[in-house]
């Protein structure tokens, strides 16, 4: 009699079940927070992008020149000041800080780090951006002057990314030495990572914790159960079907924000998705309301344009329905592209995150209605990342947030001139789009920047380097006696690990 119960019905019911509290809260290690991660990080190499769980761990161990406060405002970090210096240069004055080996953080370490990221054989996420540096001057140990090849208003925001931490210049490749609030203590691949407080951290009184034990719970329902049972203090990626029950639990607290989104990526190195008409056909084939219902239990909204939030000064309401659901138009575009009968293609997603799997299944059904048979591939997250980086798919499901709340934060998702990454389409390069992104980051006048990005968005909607699907609520949940940790607003939610330095438990 249970054979016809859907996954959605099951998880919604399971989320509402009362879990017996364990004795773990009574046997906590004082001052140690247990964090339930959504996956074991594929890599915690400092300059690579391997997902949010990895980013959270990197924010425990490392710090960059810049970062964000709890309100999402850009602030100096290892730098104590940042100022524009002429048309193309930025001047940073370093604070007195130490790496985990006791060595001081110096301008030479900053110069070495940025040169490694920009190196020809680098696989760093920000490699292309750092290749825009003309020279790095280090007049003394605590002063860095970065001269760009062209004016770059966005450099301080790039340097706030958890993909751009400063590493000790004599580090071995397998053991990068950071300057963050915690030091790597132990790890068991696939299971846990432990860090302990760094006694010489440059902020007085921080970190407030003695350590953090990060445990991987790939199953989202087990992750919630662990929190409800008291086995962990804090979890990321609260499943949407569990948000209501967690919000009502007097022992727990939910901290959620809107900002991340789901989207589609394409392999543009071969037919059929090297044709923008086919990509736009896919865009018009998707009934986005069904994704919001199936994957996010209504805790989200449709996204039929580039992911620029309506809270942004750069939002253009005239374009908000550009990729609206219109299956007749989708079929017309397929016919114009010479594929009136449709085709078969591979569709990469992952079974490890329910929102990726559920969103992909909705898209698969919608595509079938216009003649596209999309064959799903649902590996674990680490495999999904590797396949995406290598372009081993025709269509792929993506889920992320922009790098920051500036429209240039979308560049890493839509600029095909950048090195391959699972977060952007493979081999979809639109020269004019790249040119406009460069123009936007070179323009310091707000009105002129706004005009550039409006034109850029219109071009991106026509070329469809990615296709937006749905905004989603992104939540962390914690026990009531956890304080100091905050979910940063909007696109910065994945930077929230920066606040672990202020977290306390008990």
Q: What role is predicted for each listed range?
A:
Residues 200-245, 373-375:
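Ligand-site clamp/hinge motif
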Residues 245, 269, 273-312, 358-359, ...:
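Periplasmic-binding protein-like
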Residues 302-336, 353-357:
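Structural transition elements
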Residues 36-86, 115, 177-178:
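N-terminal lobe/hinge region of extracytoplasmic solute-binding protein
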Residues 478-506:
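Long beta-strand-rich cores associated with HINT superfamily self-processing modules
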Residues 83, 126-169:
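Surface-exposed binding/hinge segments that line
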Residues 70-73, 152-213, 219-222, 327-328, ...:
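Gly/Pro-rich hinge or "lid" segments in bacterial periplasmic/extracellular proteins
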């Amino acid at each position: 009699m249970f054979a016809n119960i859907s996954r959605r019905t099951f998880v919604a019911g399971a989320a509402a079940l009362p879990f017996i509290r364990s004795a773990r809260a009574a046997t906590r290690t004082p001052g140690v927070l247990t964090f339930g991660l959504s996956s074991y990080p594929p890599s915690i190499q400092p300059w690579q992008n391997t997902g949010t769980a990895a980013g959270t761990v990197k924010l425990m161990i490392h710090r960059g020149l810049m970062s964000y406060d709890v309100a999402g405002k850009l602030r100096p970090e290892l730098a104590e000041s940042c100022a524009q210096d002429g048309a193309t240069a930025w001047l940073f004055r370093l604070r007195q800080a130490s790496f985990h080996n006791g060595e001081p953080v110096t301008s030479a370490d900053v110069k070495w780090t940025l040169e490694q990221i920009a190196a020809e054989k680098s696989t760093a996420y920000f490699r292309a951006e750092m290749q825009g540096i003309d020279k790095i001057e280090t007049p003394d140990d605590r002063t860095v002057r970065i001269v760009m090849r062209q004016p770059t208003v966005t450099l301080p925001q790039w340097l706030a990314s958890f993909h751009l931490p400063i590493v000790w210049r004599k580090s071995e490749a397998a053991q990068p030495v950071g300057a963050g609030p915690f030091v790597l203590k132990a790890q068991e691949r696939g299971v846990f990572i432990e860090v302990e407080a760094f006694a010489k951290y440059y902020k007085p009184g921080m970190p407030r914790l003695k350590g953090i034990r990060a445990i991987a719970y790939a199953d989202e329902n087990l992750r919630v159960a662990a929190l409800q049972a008291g086995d962990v203090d804090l979890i990321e990626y609260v499943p949407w079907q569990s948000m209501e029950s967690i919000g009502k639990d007097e022992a727990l607290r939910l901290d959620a924000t809107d900002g991340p989104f789901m989207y589609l990526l394409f392999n543009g190195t071969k037919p059929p998705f090297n044709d923008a008409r086919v990509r736009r056909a896919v865009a018009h084939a998707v009934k986005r309301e069904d994704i919001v219902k199936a994957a996010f239990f209504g805790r989200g909204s449709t996204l039929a344009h580039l992911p620029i939030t309506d809270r942004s000064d750069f939002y253009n309401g005239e374009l908000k329905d550009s990729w609206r659901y219109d299956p007749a138009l989708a079929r017309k575009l397929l016919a114009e592209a010479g594929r009136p009968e449709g085709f078969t293609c591979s569709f990469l997603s992952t079974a490890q995150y329910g929102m990726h799997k559920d969103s992909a299944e909705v898209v698969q059904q919608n595509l079938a209605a216009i003649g596209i048979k999309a064959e799903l591939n649902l590996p674990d997250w680490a495999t999904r990342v590797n396949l995406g980086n290598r372009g081993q798919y025709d269509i792929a499901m993506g889920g992320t947030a922009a790098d920051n709340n500036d429209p240039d934060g979308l560049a890493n998702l839509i600029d095909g001139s950048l090195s391959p990454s699972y977060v952007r389409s493979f081999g979809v390069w639109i020269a004019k789009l790249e040119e406009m992104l460069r123009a936007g980051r070179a323009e310091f006048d707000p009105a002129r920047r706004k005009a550039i990005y409006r034109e850029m968005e219109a071009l991106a909607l026509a070329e469809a380097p990615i296709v937006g699907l749905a905004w989603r609520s992104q939540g962390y949940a914690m026990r009531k006696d956890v304080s100091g940790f905050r979910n940063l607003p909007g696109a910065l939610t994945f930077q929230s690990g920066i606040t672990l330095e202020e977290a306390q438990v008990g």
